[in-house]
Amino acid sequence: VMPNTPAQIRKGISAWTASKEVDQATLDFVSNMLRAIGDELKFGDEKSIDIATAVSGSGPGYVYVFIEALAEAGVELGLPVHMAQHLASQTVLGSAALQRESGKHPAELRNMVTSPGGTTSSGLAALESGGFRATIADAVHAAFERGEELAGGK
């Protein structure tokens, strides 16, 4: 089982697997227990758990860096620290909740908030030119590779 730190407030996600010998009653018990600390996803193999660890186990760290950077930019532009941090964290929380509750693909929601030639469009262009997507992918790959090293190169 690989939970993540938001499990501390029952908002986590746990990736887990079990051998084929485990009976359904035990699988149901584990699933229910994990749902007490958030969501859960059962995977069929250990490699998927290692990938999930790189995405969601390490993911809170990536999100916190994004919140820090977003808030720091607000402070640089003149907002008080506490207001910039509140804006940044609530924006991440609300955006994630909207995506989950709407069931829409993140790209669809991004397109809905982006007006041609508008402020979001300019900001997104800066993210893309700065290699934001590639940097996130690099972080996930680095975490996955480090996990394999720590596990002895599975």
Go through each PLM region and give its residues.
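Gly/Ser/Thr-rich beta-alpha loop segments that engage phosphate groups in nucleotides
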Residues: 6, 14, 56-63, 119-120
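Alpha/beta catalytic cores of group-transfer enzymes, especially the acyltransferase/condensing modules
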Residues: 6-7, 102
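Internal alpha-helical scaffold of NAD(P)-dependent oxidoreductase catalytic cores
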Residues: 13-51, 64-101, 146
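A short glycine-threonine-serine/GTX helix/turn-capping micro-motif
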Residues: 50-61, 110
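NAD(P)-dependent Rossmann-like dehydrogenase/reductase catalytic/cofactor-binding core
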Residues: 89-154
